Amino acid sequence: MPMFRSFVPRKIQPWIYLFIAVTFQLSGGVYLGALNQMIGGMALMREDILMCMYANLAGMAIYFPLLFRMKFRFTNKTLLTSAALGVLVCNLIAPHITFLPLLWLICFIEGMCKIQGTFECMSNIQLWMTPKRDFTVFFPWLHIVVLGSIQLSDLITTYLMYHYHWTYMNLFIAGLMIIVLLIQTICVKHFRFMRKFPLFGIDW
């Protein structure tokens, strides 16, 4: 993986990116494992919180067609750093926002950052998972990461909510994003696998 600096052992490089992919998949603007506590703590209706989840999913779906154009324009380090910063900021401010349109917008942006980070990690370790680009191998691994992270996210949310407070899940994810940013700063360098591709005409 040429984006890593020389001192990072080759054997652990893919595992680092797999870890980063899991951290992005654990994230969300709000966490439905603490749904009832959020309804009481933020004085919102159940439908309001569910709309946050829909906004998060919409952010991932709408941004998905742009992922390859972004990959061809920016370096892996730039994309992962910006995605981690976006998730970090969204998780820090989401618990303190009760104005619903703004909260939905924050969750929408968080979804865009989430899919950006996950895509960058998984696309770079695809050949490590299956050197022949066999999608019958790659997609089961991808589903394990995505679906496993969804279940793990609810478990962590429930644990933190029971012992501390429902907002601690947001702080936990913010802490993971700080770790991701440190990895990107220390272990990763800017690397282009092809010439810079302009964003002109991205809507086509």
Give residue spans per PLM region.
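Extracytoplasmic
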Residues: 12-49, 54, 64-67, 118
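Conserved MFS/SLC helix-loop-helix module at the cytosolic interface between two early adjacent transmembrane helices
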Residues: 62-100
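Cytoplasmic helix-loop-helix junction between adjacent transmembrane helices
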Residues: 108-144
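Helix-loop-helix hairpin linking two adjacent transmembrane segments in secondary transporters
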Residues: 138-192
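Juxtamembrane intracellular "pre-TM" segments in multi-pass secondary transporters
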Residues: 2-7, 189-204
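Small-residue-rich segments within alpha-helical transmembrane domains of MFS-like 12-TM solute carriers
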Residues: 25, 29, 95, 111-119, ...
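Short hydrophobic/small-residue motifs within alpha-helical transmembrane segments
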Residues: 56-58, 147-148
